[in-house]
Amino acid sequence: MPSGQHSAQTTKAGAGLVLGLGCERRTPAEEVIALAERALADAGVAPGDLRLVASLDARAEEPAILAAAQHFAVPAAFYDAATLEAEASRLANPSEIVFAYTGCHGVAEGAALVGAGREAVLIVQKIVSAHATAALAGPATLRAEKRIQAAEAV
């Protein structure tokens, strides 16, 4: 396992999409799951396309993050702040406030990108609820397909 990563046991192999999640401590699982489902809907993908839920290692025991992984029947991976911060140049929504609290400029986007790999892109930029954030990363080809579908729909 790469340095900086802690992973739950794998439960299924997916299509390559990674859901990055961040949340305040004790955020209700229902809120995180609803936000995660919104991210998937925004991308126009099915829950079965998801292969991983990812977050900051400080949230490795956060019930809401673990519940989201269980809800989608995918493993959860947790990365340290330095690993997420290495993705800062690829974030769509870097935050100095998040950096002050966590040591990285973006939890949801950073975790999604780390989990999806070096060639991945953000499919859904950070979206927020009252107490959580979510982002979706995956192959650049998926983002291109979504742009083509959107253009054809017009």
From Swiss-Prot:
Pathway where this protein functions: Cofactor biosynthesis; adenosylcobalamin biosynthesis
Pfam families hit by this protein: CbiG_C (PF01890)
UniProt keyword list: Cobalamin biosynthesis, Porphyrin biosynthesis
Protein biosynthesis as UniProt keyword: no
Alphabetical GO biological process terms: cobalamin biosynthetic process; porphyrin-containing compound biosynthetic process
Cross-referenced PANTHER family: COBALT-PRECORRIN-5A HYDROLASE
Protein name, UniProt field: Protein CobE
